[in-house]
Amino acid sequence: MPGHEITQQLDVVYGSTVRSKHVGRDLLAGLKNIVGGELTAYTELLEESRQEAMQRMIAKAQQLGANAIVGIRFSTSNIAQGASELFVYGTAVIVQPNAPKLPDPFNP
């Protein structure tokens, strides 16, 4: 983090959610596959899943006393037919702002 220094590394934290597709979304996505274009229903589902997993990870970091998470990574996997997991993880840390450097009066 620019302007900050990691003073303590706490632990790996994670969050996940498992979501299933909706039959109505599947039908619309199937039609969209024929004509092409963005599958907005799935884009929205993925965004909701990402936010939920992130909030769970942040809550775990806060329980440890962290004020930042570094090295965040996302992963997805199929759990069952029609159900997928979105998994996010990172390292919970404590950061502090760097002390401002005072100008050297002898070396302008």
UniProtKB/Swiss-Prot annotation:
SUPFAM superfamilies: YbjQ-like (SSF117782). Coiled coil: none annotated. Transmembrane segments: none annotated. Pfam families: YbjQ_1. Belongs to the UPF0145 family. HAMAP family: UPF0145. This is UPF0145 protein ACIAD2946. It comes from Acinetobacter baylyi (strain ATCC 33305 / BD413 / ADP1).
